[in-house]
Amino acid sequence: EVLLSRLSKSREIDRIILATSSQLDNQPLVDYVDKLSYDVFQGSEKDVLDRYYRAALKYSPDAIVRITGDCPLIDPSIVDTVVRSYKESNADYVSNTNPPTYPDGLDVEVFSFSALDSAFKEAKLPFDREHVTTYIRESGKFKIGNVANSKNYSNERWTVDEPEDYQVVKSIFKHFLPRINFSWNEVLKLRNTEPDIFSLNQHLNRNEGSKMGTGQKLWGRAKRIIPGGNMLLSKRSEMFLPNQWPSYFSRAKGCKVWDL
C-alpha cells in the first residue's frame, strides 16, 4: 500500500497497475489492492515476462514503467526523472541501474512496448522470462540509456528481499510516521544521523536476488537453515549438479516430482 501511495505522487505515470500472479494465495493481495482502487492484472507465476506482456496488451501503454514490489521506498521524483529521460531520448530502455548510483530499492525501468514485444517473442531462457528485462538489456538489440545520480549511493540497501531488509525499512517508516511520502533525500539524512537503523542489512549484496533463478535462491535459504544445504543427498551437491545448485521440489511421488 505504501509503495502504491508513493507511486501515485508521480507526475509522469498515467496509470498504476499491480501485475501479480494468478496463484490463489495472491487473492488477498488482489482483493486489497482492488479496494484501494488500483488496477490489478493477474498472470503467470514463473513467466513474469509473459505476465507483463499480457498486461500491456490489455492496457495498451506507449511505454511501461517497471517498479518491483521489493521497493517500498521508491521516490516519485526519481521515477519522473527516469521517465523524462526516456521521453527525451530515442532509447528503447532507460533505467537508473545500469550502472546503479542510487540506493538499492529505488530502481526504475522504463521501456517501450515494442521492446517488450520483441523480448516476449525472442527470449527463451527461463532466467530471462523470470526477470522480464534482462533480454532487453543484454541482447545487444536495443538502445539502452541510464540515469546517474551526481553522487554514488549504490552501496546503500533500501530494498526488501530478506528479513533484515524488512527490519531496516520498517524502522525507516516508523521514524517518519505519520508521513509515508517522505523523500529519498530525507532517508539519506536519516542515514547520516541514525546509522544504526541501517546497519542490520549492510552485509547483503546489491541485486543479489535479481541475478539468481528460483532454485539458486532456495539453495541459499537452505544453506542458512540446514547444515550443508541438504539432509538427503548421498554425495556433496557441489560435485555433480550444474552450477553447484541443486533442485528443490514441492512434492514427489514414485518417479514423479513437482518442481518448485
Where are the regions a protein language model picked out?
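Acidic donor-binding/catalytic loop of UDP-sugar-dependent glycosyltransferases
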Residues: 48-54, 58, 68-85
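A recurrent flexible, glycine/aromatic-enriched loop bordering the glycosyltransferase active site
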Residues: 97-108, 151-152
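Conserved N-terminal catalytic core of the sugar/cofactor nucleotidyltransferase
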Residues: 1-62
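Short aromatic-hydrophobic micro-motifs that form the base-stacking/packing surface
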Residues: 63-67
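N-terminal glycine-rich, Lys/His-bearing helix-loop that initiates the first secondary-structure elements
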Residues: 212-260
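Conserved nucleotide-sugar donor-binding
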Residues: 61, 108-120, 163-167
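Conserved alpha/beta core of the MobA/IspD/sugar-nucleotide pyrophosphorylase nucleotidyltransferase superfamily
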Residues: 111, 131-211
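Conserved donor-nucleotide/metal-binding helix-loop-beta segment in metal-dependent transferases, i.e.
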Residues: 75-101
